[in-house]
C-alpha cells in the first residue's frame, strides 16, 4: 500500500523501517527541528534523520492545518497513514485525506492510558499487565476504534525503555498484519475503564523515601531514560542510576547500611539499595565509592534539599 508515516523519536524509527520494507512509503512527516546539545543548535528528529538518510520524502510542518502541508499530503496520495509517537493531534482536515484513514500504534491497552506516556504511567501505577493497540485515529486523544490488541505481563525488572521497545516490536507485527487485511477489517469501539497518561515532569523523577521501596523501584523504572530518578544529599542532586528494593527496616531517608554492594536507605516499607549513582557535576560511580568520597555512613539522612 501507499503509506504516509507520522513519527518523531528514536522509538518510532523501527516502525518506519518495517513499513518501508513491506509497503511504499510515499511521505514521512516529523516534528520541526528542535534545539539540542550544549550549543542548542536546531537538529532533526531521529525519524527525520532516518528519512533523509534513506531518501524518503520528508516534511516537518509547524502546523498540520496549513494548506501547504495538506496539499502536499494530498499530492502524495497515501492510501493510509500510520502514526507512531508523532507528538501532535492530527486534525480532521488531514484525517480525511487517506481513503483508509490514519492508523496509530499505541503502547497501552486502550482505553487505558490514552496520551503521551502510557508505558511510564503503567509502570508508575504498578500495573501487572499492559499491551499494545492498533487503532484508527479520530479527532480525539487516542479515542478511535481498535483493529487489534495484544496483552502481556510486565516483567519484574522491566523499565520504560525495555517495555516500550518490546511493545513497539510486537505492535509492528500487529500493524503489518492489519495493513495486509485493512480493506476487509472493521474496527471495534473501545470499551472499558478510561485513563490518561500525561507526559512526565522532571519532578516525577525525585525519590521520596517516604514511599515504599517497591514504589520507589517502580518510579525508577518508569522514569527511564528521562527524567531519570534522583535524590538530594547536602542540597545537591544525585542521580540514582541503578538500584533495587530489598527486605529490611529503616527510618525513611536514613542510610541503614553501607557495604561493598551499595548503600541501603530506609523507606516507608523495606530498604532501597543504591547500586550506582552520579553526583551533580561528576561521573557515574558505584554507590559504595560515592559513600566513601562523600561521607555517607549509617545514620546519614538523604533527600533533604
UniProtKB/Swiss-Prot annotation:
The gene is fmt. GO terms for molecular function: methionyl-tRNA formyltransferase activity. It catalyses: L-methionyl-tRNA(fMet) + (6R)-10-formyltetrahydrofolate = N-formyl-L-methionyl-tRNA(fMet) + (6S)-5,6,7,8-tetrahydrofolate + H(+). PANTHER family: METHIONYL-TRNA FORMYLTRANSFERASE, METHIONYL-TRNA FORMYLTRANSFERASE, MITOCHONDRIAL. GO terms for cellular component: cytosol. Keywords: Protein biosynthesis, Transferase. Its EC number is 2.1.2.9. This is Methionyl-tRNA formyltransferase. It holds the Pfam family Formyl_trans_N. Gene3D superfamilies: 3.40.50.12230. InterPro entries: Fmt, Formyl_trans_C, Formyl_transf_N, Formyl_transf_N_sf, Formyl_transferase-like_C_sf, Met-tRNA-FMT_C, Met-tRNA-FMT_N. Attaches a formyl group to the free amino group of methionyl-tRNA(fMet). The formyl group appears to play a dual role in the initiator identity of N-formylmethionyl-tRNA by promoting its recognition by IF2 and preventing the misappropriation of this tRNA by the elongation apparatus. Belongs to the Fmt family. (6S)-5,6,7,8-tetrahydrofolate binds at residues 108-111.
Amino acid at each position: 500500500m501507499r503509506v504516509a508515516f507520522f513519527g518523531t523519536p528514536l522509538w518510532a524509527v523501527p516502525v518506519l523501517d518495517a513499513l518501508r520494507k513491506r509497503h511504499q512509503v510515499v511521505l514521512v512527516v516529523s516534528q520541526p527541528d528542535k534545539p539540542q546539545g550544549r550549543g542548542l543548535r536546531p537538529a532533526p528528529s531521529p525519524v527525520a534523520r532516518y528519512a533523509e538518510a534513506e531518501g524518503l520524502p520528508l516534511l516537518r510542518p509547524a502546523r498540520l492545518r496549513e494548506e501547504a502541508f495538506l496539499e502536499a499530503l494530498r499530492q502524495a496520495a497515501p492510501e493510509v497513514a500510520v502514526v507512531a509517537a508523532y507528538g501532535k493531534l492530527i486534525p480532521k482536515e488531514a484525517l480525511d485525506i487517506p481513503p483508509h484513514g490514519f492508523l496509530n500504534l499505541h503502547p497501552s491497552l486502550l482505553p487505558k492510558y490514552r496520551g503521551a506516556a502510557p508505558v511510564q504511567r503503567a509502570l508508575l501505577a504498578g500495573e501487572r499487565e499492559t499491551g499494545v493497540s492498533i487503532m484508527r485515529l479520530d479527532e480525539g486523544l487516542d479515542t478511535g476504534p481498535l483493529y487489534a490488541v495484544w496483552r502481556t505481563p510486565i516483567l519484574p525488572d522491566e523499565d520504560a525503555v525495555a517495555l516500550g521497545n518490546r511493545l513497539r516490536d510486537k505492535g509492528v507485527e500487529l500493524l503489518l498484519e492489519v495493513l495486509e487485511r485493512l480493506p476487509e477489517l472493521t474496527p471495534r469501539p473501545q470499551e472499558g475503564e478510561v485513563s490518561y497518561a500525561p507526559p512526565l515532569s522532571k519532578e516525577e523523577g525525585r525519590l521520596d523515601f517516604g514511599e515504599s521501596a517497591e514504589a520507589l523501584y517502580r518510579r525508577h523504572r518508569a522514569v527511564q531514560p528521562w527524567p531519570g530518578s534522583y535524590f538530594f544529599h547536602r542540597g545537591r542532586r544525585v542521580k540514582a542510576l541503578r538500584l533495587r528494593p530489598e527486605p529490611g527496616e529503616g527510618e525513611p531517608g536514613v542510610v541503614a547500611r553501607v557495604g561493598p554492594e551499595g548503600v541501603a536507605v530506609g523507606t516507608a516499607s523495606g530498604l532501597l539499595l543504591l547500586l550506582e549513582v552520579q553526583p551533580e557535576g561528576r561521573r557515574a560511580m558505584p554507590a559504595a565509592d560515592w559513600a566513601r568520597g562523600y561521607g555517607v555512613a549509617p545514620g546519614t539522612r538523604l533527600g533533604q534539599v
